[in-house]
Amino acid sequence: MATINQLVRKPRKDKMKKSNVPALEACPQRRGVCTRVYTTTPKKPNSALRKVARVRLTNGYEVSSYIGGEGHNLQEHSVILIRGGRVKDLPGVRYHTVRGSLDCAGVDGRKQGRSKYGAKRPKG
């Protein structure tokens, strides 16, 4: 235990929390250019072809970003916006693509949870 005098001279240091999304550099989203768009398979109990883009960000980082929703229009050199949020069954994928912004189209035919996929409200 430190004495009060010791604490007055040198206060206790706060523990630093390590960021889960270091490439965002404390920003809510970042813009980047797709360098590669590909599919990959998830970890053990799951089975699928998950859509992933390798993205070179404006701050120089290169990260993998998950493309959510059914179907997408992304290809190499597409400019996209990424946000934080990992994909539990894809190791190394710690970012999500923001659908419906920049070059990434929203999911068409989406009726529920539309705001997460950049889908407009259906007519009628």
From Swiss-Prot:
The keyword Aminoacyl-tRNA synthetase does not apply. GO terms for cellular component: small ribosomal subunit. It comes from the Bacteria. SUPFAM superfamilies: Nucleic acid-binding proteins. Belongs to the universal ribosomal protein uS12 family. With S4 and S5 plays an important role in translational accuracy. Interacts with and stabilizes bases of the 16S rRNA that are involved in tRNA selection in the A site and with the mRNA backbone. Located at the interface of the 30S and 50S subunits, it traverses the body of the 30S subunit contacting proteins on the other side and probably holding the rRNA structure together. The combined cluster of proteins S8, S12 and S17 appears to hold together the shoulder and platform of the 30S subunit. This is Small ribosomal subunit protein uS12. It comes from Hydrogenovibrio crunogenus (strain DSM 25203 / XCL-2). The lineage of its organism: Bacteria, Pseudomonadati, Pseudomonadota, Gammaproteobacteria, Thiotrichales. The gene is rpsL.
